[in-house]
Amino acid sequence: MTADHRAGRLERVRAALAERDTDALLLGPSADYRWLLGYEPPGLERLTMLVVSAAGDDHLVVPALEAPLAIEHLGDLGVKVLAWQETEDPIALVVGALAAAGSASQSRLAVGDHLFATFLLRLQAAMPSARYTTSSVVTGPLRRIKDQAEIDALARAGAAIDAVVDRLGEWVVPGRAERDVAADLDVAIRAAGHEQTNFTIVGSGPNGASPHHIAGHRVIQPGDAVVIDIGGRVDGYCSDTTRTLVVGEPPEGFAELYEVLRTAQAAGCDAVRPGVTAASVDAACRDIITEAGYGEYFIHRTGHGIGLEEHEDPYIVAGNDEPLSPGMAFSVEPGIYLPGRHGARIEDIVVCTEDGGRRLNTTSRELRVVG
């Protein structure tokens, strides 16, 4: 991210603060922090806090041992680094930074959604008259719309995870434990260009009916349906895709169930276009599954936003009447889960464009037989 890019984001945050009559944004290490500064220090017991003021006087309070890293990354961005020693109270530096920026004790402050509770409680004790809200009311609307560089990063992440999906038949074979398949997937995800693996869900047979199953000791058997949900991070941006395979002959009725799911997922992707609500995309998938008699077995929302985080705004769920806009990126991932038997899910990342929806995953969604 260029210095101009970061400076532009800081200006947009300041404008959002002013619009919401909020004096400052306070962020610890988080996706919001990374979105603004282009790097993220470790979120440890030592306080790191970025103070972005609506007045334009920004500070970064950091432990002294991490100050060189902060200075290197900030460059000439104009953020003042306040390094604190082990014997100092960093909250006092935060309060001082707010005062220097003109924020009084009764300020309205937007605090990072993922800030450690211990830091927030200490800040509230130091500024009991301040009014507090969450950072997402400020940063959420800004991060929700991806710029072209972000979309390009998501596309690279999608291509990298697709390269792993193309090889699933190498690992999903009878006689292998789920956890061993997950370990191979972790290696393959990194080898495909991800700097880290975010998750490797391998749910075989009845375990596939648990959407967030943790890969365990169960051995994959002939006739199993196997749900594979994998993702990582490329250039800071996340990939996330799900495919369902069958080992040999599909279980009774599974091919018909899967075809319902495939039709529903395609309908959800086709429904994406500017002005359509998130709830409408959910309904496009859910109505087909419900009409086929599987409605009670579709037990989660249709999708979630994606970017610097695996799950972020917008959420594709009933009741979310927010209209889609070009630049929004999210998953479309309906699933059908029959407890004690098997599950199935298909997931693609979709970007809303001026003309409709662009899928960032291109691997086949046909029922794939392996083993």
Predicted features along the sequence, with ranges:
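Active-site neighborhoods and metal-handling regions in enzymes and metal-associated proteins
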Residues: 1-371
